[in-house]
């Protein structure tokens, strides 16, 4: 009932250093009461504490990748030039949430727009599925002008059936993905009209509704799914539970509202693939622009055709062999008869 159990402050560890100042920004707790903290100016990763509040180390450190060109340039540049160059230090996390399996979904700012969301297993390894276009918000953006640059993903909320949503503070948009990293839908934006944000700072859910905190407007916006969004969520959830047949019916309803929604065709195609209807699956994957599953369906369909016609091919080959044997025997017999007539 809101009783204070424990206060965690100033964790002590050799890896933190003597003068470390603990400035927690965000906190999350998993099913085993392990505590995860994003702390200010903490680049080593997310701080982890056990159920008793003891600091146990870091998880999910983001290693900065240095390209070969950057390494060569740093070797060739002068000391003054190197001093002006950006330091290659790990990136801070900006938001996190823990799913029902104990995996930590964490967001970070990535200027390149390549990976702004991670799903960390208990070992701290990123096991997130990125889909065809990644899970970092916008895949195309302007380099100059207002709202330029990659999406700045600052927070994440985990929803039901493997669905999760992230919020971009650059353009104020919310991106929702399924557990495979497929983009489901986008909404929101920067503006003054209803349904837009000034400075979105956090995202969460209450039941089936999404709530977003706006730091400048000092208010909380609440969103409820439209029929279109509801059908997509339902289709993804049914497939997540293994109910492919029911998911197909939902995808068909989605296509009535948006005939260009590629993921719906892919969802229907996967159902056909599971049912062994490979030709129909190929058609759906082609329309859904999914080369990976199209190749799988094509190989299965090719094997299916070969198997169906194998008996015919073997029969034709057997008949041909018999004819060749008979022809050979008849030819030998005639040759012997001619030879005997000449003697």
Report the location of each language-model feature.
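Eukaryotic scaffold repeat domains enriched in small/polar residues
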Residues: 1-278, 285-289, 295-343
């Amino acid at each position: 009932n809101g009783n204070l159990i424990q206060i965690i402050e100033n964790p002590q560890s050799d890896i933190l250093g003597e003068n470390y100042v603990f400035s927690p920004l965000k906190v999350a707790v998993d099913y085993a009461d392990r505590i995860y903290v994003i702390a200010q100016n903490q680049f080593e990763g997310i701080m982890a504490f056990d159920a008793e509040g003891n600091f146990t180390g870091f998880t999910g450190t983001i290693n900065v990748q240095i390209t070969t060109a950057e390494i060569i340039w740093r070797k060739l540049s002068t000391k003054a030039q190197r001093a002006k160059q950006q330091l290659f230090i790990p990136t801070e996390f900006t938001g996190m949430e823990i799913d029902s399996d104990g995996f930590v979904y964490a967001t970070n700012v990535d200027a390149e727009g390549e990976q702004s969301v991670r799903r960390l297993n208990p070992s701290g390894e990123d096991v997130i599925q990125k889909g065809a276009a990644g899970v970092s918000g916008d895949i195309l953006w302007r380099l100059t002008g207002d709202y330029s640059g990659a999406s700045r993903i600052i927070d994440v909320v985990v929803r039901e059936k493997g669905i999760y949503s992230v919020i971009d503070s650059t353009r104020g948009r919310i991106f929702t993905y399924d557990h495979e990293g497929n983009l489901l839908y986008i909404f929101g934006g920067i503006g003054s009209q209803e349904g837009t944000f000034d400075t979105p700072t956090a995202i969460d859910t209450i039941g089936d509704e999404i709530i977003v905190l706006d730091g400048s407007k000092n208010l909380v916006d609440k969103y409820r799914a439209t029929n279109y969004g509801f059908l997509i969520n339902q289709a993804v959830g049914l497939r997540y539970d293994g109910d492919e047949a029911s998911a197909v019916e939902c995808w068909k309803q989605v296509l009535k509202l948006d005939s260009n929604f590629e993921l719906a065709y892919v969802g229907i195609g996967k159902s056909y693939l599971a049912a062994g209807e490979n030709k129909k699956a190929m058609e759906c994957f082609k329309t859904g622009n999914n080369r990976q599953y199209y190749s799988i369906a094509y190989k299965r369909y090719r094997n299916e055709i070969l198997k169906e016609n194998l008996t015919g091919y073997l029969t034709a080959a057997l008949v041909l062999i018999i004819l060749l044997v008979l022809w050979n025997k008849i030819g030998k017999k005639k040759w012997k008869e001619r030879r005997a007539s000449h003697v």
